[in-house]
Amino acid sequence: MLTVDFIDDNAQIDAKHLPEIERLLIFAAEQEGIDEEAEVAVSFVDENEIQAINKAYRNKDAVTDVISFALEEGEDDFEMSDEPRVLGDIIICVKRALEQAEEYGHSFERELGFLSLHGLLHLLGYDHMNESDEARMFGRQDEILNAFGLRRDV
């Protein structure tokens, strides 16, 4: 089962939102066949912090909504151990999530779910660098969100 660790050093988000994000990520991991013990960290940051991370690691000096860092990237075989599989980190800019929820006409909860799931799918190897990969990733996102009950109209 997936364990989700939340990091919110600057009180960016109301804790009432965390249980649903955790349930969604556990549901998504199950949908993706992650049946062993695994961990993911979800951090909530402000615009300055995500811009600094984006610049340092992606060479893009701009605010973004979500960034993920896969700890297993490029590894084909994972050592068998008693330790949980550490998938990586998902970093969400709360202000961008609020803005995008308003822009897209859905709830803040739906946007948080979308961004959390988007980050998790990146950790699991999905990307959107070309048209076919984007269609695959975004289609999978919609399938999982809808199956979980977090549709666009929510």
From Swiss-Prot:
One of its GO terms (molecular function) is zinc ion binding. Pfam families: YbeY. Single strand-specific metallo-endoribonuclease involved in late-stage 70S ribosome quality control and in maturation of the 3' terminus of the 16S rRNA. Keywords: Cytoplasm, Endonuclease, Hydrolase, Metal-binding, Nuclease, Ribosome biogenesis, rRNA processing, Zinc. This is Endoribonuclease YbeY. Its EC number is 3.1.-.-. It comes from the Bacteria. One of its GO terms (cellular component) is cytoplasm. Zn(2+) binds at H118, H122, H128. Belongs to the endoribonuclease YbeY family. Disulfide bonds: none annotated. Its main location: cytoplasm. Transmembrane segments: none annotated. GO terms for biological process: rRNA processing. It comes from Macrococcus caseolyticus (strain JCSC5402) (Macrococcoides caseolyticum). InterPro entries: MetalPrtase_cat_dom_sf_prd, YbeY, YbeY_CS. It is found in: Cytoplasm.
